Design a protein with these regions (language model features):
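Extended, non-catalytic subsegments within catalytic or DNA/protein-binding/adaptor domains
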Residues: 1-304
């Protein structure tokens, strides 16, 4: 089938689906399956009664943020099916308000990996088989200095890197905040010695022989490199394994810890929000406020 014919077969639902990041679509799909599996009578379109029953069931064992996300997924499923959404019914809204008051809305955030944490991780990551050492070191440094999301690290390609004397520029072809694929360029400046992102990437490419395609790939127990890219989950697992080797609780960390650590460290260093946003690609300063609060809290001097 040629490209023109293929395009002609796309439906409105296809374009709606394409408007969302791949990871977001996957989460929506999983959430929809949870709803359908909760009761054999559940379907799309759903009734207000079905949503209310499901909401009450979720309230017994899920966090508020998870409940909210699943309701959003159900709302999107109705929109994509061209059906009115029962999620915005006053009865559902009232139930959700009650759940928030009862359970609270405190969010569980991944612990930030600040500079000292990162340097300690690089020491323990430097012990092991050559390929894993090179990949993991580059992954940690680039992920932290570039404040990358785990999904962005997983899909980085060699072709996205521009080598400069002063550092490297990495173009994100697709990301959570750039779903249109217009691209966002991050500049990662040079640093001293083994903590330099440019040198770490050059070393990884030299020992791995990876000069095109996906940059970060799986490595088996024989230190052999795979062809496919790492998954976002694999990025988190690498971070967790290395943080555990430093004696910390891996359950408190995730792939997001690198990004959170860069922003927290930047706030502690007094870097203005607009400059941090040039790295993080946050769309508003409001999103950075939780890191700003952490930074200000940690600046409080001891009175003893």
């Amino acid at each position: 089938m040629n490209e023109q014919a293929s395009s002609a077969t796309l439906t409105e639902a296809d374009y709606v689906a394409a408007s969302k990041a791949q990871s977001t679509r996957k989460e929506y799909g999983k959430d929809l399956h949870y709803f359908l599996d909760a009761d054999s009578s559940n379907c799309i379109p759903a009734s207000v009664d079905q949503i209310a029953t499901y909401l009450a069931k979720m309230a017994g064992h899920l966090a508020v943020k998870t409940i909210e996300r699943r309701l959003i997924s159900l709302h999107v499923a109705h929109l994509e099916a061209g059906e009115p959404s029962p999620v915005h019914h006053q009865r559902i809204k009232a139930m959700l308000r009650g759940i928030r008051r009862t359970k609270g809305i405190a969010t569980k955030q991944a612990t930030a990996i600040v500079k000292d944490d990162l340097l300690e991780m690089l020491v323990v990551a430097g012990k092991g088989k050559p390929m894993q050492v090179a990949r993991n070191s580059a992954l940690l440094i680039v992920g932290w200095v570039g404040a990358f999301r785990r999904s962005e690290l997983a899909t980085l390609r060699c072709e996205d890197i521009a080598w400069l004397d002063s550092g490297i520029e990495i173009t994100l072809r697709h990301s959570k905040v750039d779903q249109s694929g217009a691209g966002f360029v991050k500049f990662l400046p040079n640093a001293h010695g083994s903590r330099c992102p440019r040198l770490a990437l050059q070393h990884w490419q030299t020992v791995s022989g990876i000069t095109e395609g996906y940059l970060f790939r799986p490595i088996n127990r024989h230190d052999q490199i795979g062809e496919q890219p790492l998954t976002p989950h694999a990025v988190s697992q690498i971070v967790k394994r290395i943080i555990e080797l430093t004696g910390r609780d891996p359950a408190k960390y995730s792939g997001h810890s690198l990004r959170a650590g860069f922003v927290t460290e930047g706030v502690l260093a007094g870097i203005p929000s607009y400059q941090l946003m040039q790295v993080t690609a946050h769309r508003s300063e409001q999103t950075l406020q939780k890191y700003v609060r952490i930074g200000k809290r940690r600046r409080i001097p001891s009175l003893l």
